[in-house]
């Protein structure tokens, strides 16, 4: 997989290309990265790529021509079709399912905005999709781009040492993950649940599923509304709801 970022701050991506599982996978050649600086495509000696907005208003707007040239340069680096994504609070929310879809693609180009935004004509002519990482504003698209990259890359075969880790993460099954424990057996008066030390894999799997459903019901009930539960999950969830009704009565 080739991922390119159109950014005026290429060095920011060192954290994902050099460190952790994504850095290791990059060194192993499982995925490749290139930062494309649109300043190199500016039509002025000083490398300006922004200007004041028509109609007035605060801040500066990134200009379409240098960004378009940077995107076209990025596309030319691969013979495979590229999907151009603009990281924007106006985009559709990034979900696990979207990350799964993007992990199947051979070439992604991530457009990282700065200042007050990007000329709308560039978005209409050169961007395939806008994606948001949440309903809040950050200073630029670089951090959202790296969050998207991490979410996508961990789903690419070979990036994680054990793909089961990705399969069991929160959201991969549509519900939140269960609690996890390791040594010591007791910490500040809190002991590891007995069932996890029982060696009974059936009971452990049942406990973990129940804890996942409890946590999802408490913290993200909206996820349960979107999910079609299998009979085993419905049975456990009904048990949890019955317990809650008894406590409230």
UniProtKB/Swiss-Prot annotation:
Supply the alphabetized keyword list: Cytoplasm, Methyltransferase, S-adenosyl-L-methionine, Transferase, tRNA processing
Would you say which domain of life the source belongs to? Bacteria
Any single Pfam family the record assigns to this protein? tRNA_m1G_MT
User: Where's it found, cell-wise?
Assistant: Cytoplasm
Single GO molecular function: tRNA (guanine(37)-N1)-methyltransferase activity
Which terms under GO biological process does the entry name? tRNA N1-guanine methylation
Its EC number(s): 2.1.1.228
* Recorded GO CC terms: cytosol
The reactions it catalyses are:
guanosine(37) in tRNA + S-adenosyl-L-methionine = N(1)-methylguanosine(37) in tRNA + S-adenosyl-L-homocysteine + H(+)
Q: Which residues bind S-adenosyl-L-methionine?
A: 113, 133-138
Query: Known InterPro entries for this protein?
Result: Alpha/beta_knot_MTases, tRNA_m1G_MeTrfase_C_sf, tRNA_m1G_MeTrfase_TrmD, tRNA_m1G_MTases_N, tRNA_MeTrfase_TRMD/TRM10
Complex and partners:
Homodimer.
Q: What does this protein do?
A: Specifically methylates guanosine-37 in various tRNAs.
Family recorded in the similarity comment = Belongs to the RNA methyltransferase TrmD family.
Question: Could you tell me what this protein is called?
Answer: tRNA (guanine-N(1)-)-methyltransferase
Gene behind the chain: trmD
């Amino acid at each position: 997989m080739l991922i390119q970022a159109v950014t005026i701050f290429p060095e920011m991506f060192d954290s994902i290309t050099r460190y952790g599982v994504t850095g290791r996978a990059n060194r192993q050649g499982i995925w490749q990265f290139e930062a494309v600086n649109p300043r190199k495509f500016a039509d002025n000696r000083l490398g300006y790529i922004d200007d004041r907005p028509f109609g007035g208003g605060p801040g500066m707007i990134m200009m379409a021509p240098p960004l378009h040239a940077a995107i076209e340069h990025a596309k030319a680096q691969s013979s495979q079709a590229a999907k151009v994504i603009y990281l924007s609070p106006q985009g559709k929310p990034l979900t696990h399912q979207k990350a799964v879809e993007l992990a199947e693609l051979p070439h992604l180009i991530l457009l990282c905005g700065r200042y007050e935004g990007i000329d709308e004509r560039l978005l209409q002519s050169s961007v395939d999709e806008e994606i948001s990482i949440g309903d809040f504003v950050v200073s630029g698209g670089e951090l959202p781009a790296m969050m998207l990259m991490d979410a996508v890359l961990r789903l690419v075969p070979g990036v994680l040492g054990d793909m089961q880790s990705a399969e069991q993460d929160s959201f991969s099954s549509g519900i939140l993950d269960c609690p996890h424990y390791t040594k010591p057996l007791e910490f500040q008066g809190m002991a590891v649940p007995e069932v996890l030390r029982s060696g009974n894999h059936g009971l452990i799997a049942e406990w973990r599923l129940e804890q996942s459903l409890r946590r999802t019901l408490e913290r993200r009930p909206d996820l349960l509304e979107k999910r079609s539960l299998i009979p085993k999950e419905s049975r456990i969830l009904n048990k949890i709801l019955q317990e809650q009704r008894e406590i409230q009565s």
